[in-house]
Amino acid sequence: MSKIRTLNRQFISNLETHKAVTDAKRNLILSILKSTTTKREAKNYLTKYQNQFDLPDETPKAGTIYEQSLSRRDNQRELFIKRFLNAQNPFISIYDDEETKLQKIPLRLAIFKIKFPTISLRQWKGIAETFKRLMTLGISPIILLDYDHLSHGSFKKNELYMINQANKMLSILGKPEEQEDLKATILRNSFSVADGQITIDSLELILIPLYQGIIPIIQPIVFNADTTMQEFLKCNTLLNSLCTALVDRRTTDLLSIEKIVMIDPLGGIPSIERKQTSHVFINLSQEYSDIMSELFIGHISPKIRDLHVENLNSMNEILTSIFEKSGNDETTGIITTPEVMSIHNDQLNPIIYNVLTDRSIISSSLPSTNKRTPQLSTTIVKKGVDVQIFDQENNFSGSDFTMDNLIASKKVDKKKLTELLEDSFGKKLIVDEYYERINNRLATFILVGDYDGAAIITWEYSGDKKVAYLDKFAIAKRNQGLPGLADIIFKIILQSHPVELIWRSRKNNPVNKWYFERCCGCMSAPESQWKIFYTGDIFDKRIDRMKDKKKQNNKKKKTATMMMMNNSQKVAGVNADTHVDILKNLEQYSDICEGIVPSFA
C-alpha cells in the first residue's frame, strides 16, 4: 500500500513539474510574440537567446548523463565556475570532445553605465523591474556606476558617499533571499592602472557572479600601481577598458556583448531636425562626423554639449573597438534616461524592445514634421554600414554624371548592381534597356556596404517639369528585415532630394504601408496598376483639411483620384508667397510614373 502511495505522489509531482515547465515555456513564448511585431523578429530573437533559458526538460533525452547535464545552461556554468577557480580552461573536454559536440551557451551581456544622482525611488523600482525582465529574456547585466559629477575632493569622503549610494541601490534592487528579487554584488578595486594602461585585475570576479545569475555592480575605483594609491577615473574611460577586456580572444566562447547602455538624465543625442529631441538611430559609419559637427553649431549650451559629445565619442570608440577585436558589428549602443528605463512595458521600454527586435521603438525614417511621429529621448547607436553617395557634386569627378561613367570609372560594379536588383525584386532585369534608360537621367546613386542595398534616383520630365524620381530601392534578400538598413537608405534618399520626390509601387505591394507612413500623399487611377507616392518640402505638412477637401471637390471632373494621407497636411509652398498647384503636380507625377516602362521581364 505504501508503494502505491509513493507512486501516486511521484505521479502527482511529475504532473505538477510538467505543468510548471509547460506554463513557463508558454508564458515566455507568448510574451516574446506579443512584444515583437514580425515573425522574423521573433525568430531572430529565439535563435540567439533560446539556449539562455534553463527550463527543465519534461522527458529525459537519449545520451549519457554527462551529455544531458552539460547540455543545460546552469550545469555548464557551474562547471565553468569550478574550473575558473582552479585556473583551468573551462572548455576542456566539453566543446573539443568530438563525441560530445555540445552547443556553446555564451553569456549575452548588456553593460549599463548609470549616472544616477537624480534618480528617484520610483524610477529605481522601475529600473529594477527592467533588469528582472532583461534577465528573464536571457540578458546578463553588468552595472558600472558613474560618479563623474563628484568634485575632486577627499577620496575618503567620496568613497563613503559611493558606498552609501551603492547600498541604497542594493536595497532597492531586492532581497537576495527572495526568489523573485534580483541578486547583486558590489565590486571594488576591479581596475588597476600602471604607466597609463588600465587593466582588469581579475575578469573572473565579474564572470563568476554572472554565471551565478548575480548582477555585478562595479565602482569606478582603480589602484594606481605608480603611486600605490586608490583613485577615481572617468566612467567612460573605465567603460571602454571593461569592454576591451571582455572581448579579449580568450573570452570568445564565454560571452558576447549585446548592448552598451548609457543611462543619463540628458537622454539621447539631440537632433536639430527633431527640435532638440533625440536622434532615433545613428549609423556611426556614415553619420558620426556630421552629428558631431551639428552638436557644435550652438543649439545647446556648451556644458550640455560637452556631455553629449563625451557620450557619443565614448560609444563610437567602444563599438569600433568591439568590431575590430571580435569582428562583431551587431553590438548595439543605447543612450536613454532613467525615466525611460523605468517604463514597465516591453513595447515602450527601448532597452527591452531592442533586445527583442534589435531596433528602435520607432523608425528613424519617419518624417519628423509629422505630428504622429513620437518625440523620443532615446538614441540607438550602431557601428553600422558604410554608405557611398554619388551625384554630380559628391564622389564623382567626371564631366558627365552618367551610369556609364560610374561603371567605367569602377565606382559601380555593373554585375554586382544587377545581381542586387534581381535578388531584391526577385525578377530578371532587362539589363541593356534599363541601363540605357537611366544612363543620362541619373540624379543620385546610393550604395550601402558591399552591395547590401542601393537606391537609384533619376531626373524625369513632364513637359518642362523636372522631378526627382526614386527609380529603384533595393535591399539584398539576405538583409531584408535587417534592423535599420531600409531606414538608413531612405533617410539618405530624402536628404538628397528634400524639395520634391516621387516614386511608384504596384498596388498590391505589401511595402506600400511602409511607404504610406513616409510620404506626404499618394494617388492612384482606377485603371492603373500603380500607386504613386510623393513627398518634399514643397508640401507643407500643416494642411487645413476642409480647404483641401473643398479644392478636391471643385476638381472632381479630373480622371486621377487622389488620396491625401496626412490628417494635417496643407498644399502650400515653402514660403508664404509661393503656392503649389497640386492638381497640375499630380497630373505631371502621373504622366511620369505611368510613362516609365517596366524594368523587369
Swiss-Prot record:
It comes from Lodderomyces elongisporus (strain ATCC 11503 / CBS 2605 / JCM 1781 / NBRC 1676 / NRRL YB-4239) (Yeast). Residues 401-558 form the N-acetyltransferase domain. Keywords: Acyltransferase, Amino-acid biosynthesis, Mitochondrion, Transferase, Transit peptide. N-acetylglutamate synthase involved in arginine biosynthesis. InterPro entries: GlcNAc_Synth_fun, Vertebrate-like_GNAT_dom. One of its GO terms (molecular function) is L-glutamate N-acetyltransferase activity. It catalyses: L-glutamate + acetyl-CoA = N-acetyl-L-glutamate + CoA + H(+). Pathway: Amino-acid biosynthesis; L-arginine biosynthesis; N(2)-acetyl-L-ornithine from L-glutamate: step 1/4. Pfam families: NAT (PF04768). It comes from the Eukaryota. This is Amino-acid acetyltransferase, mitochondrial. GO terms for cellular component: mitochondrial matrix. It is found in: Mitochondrion.
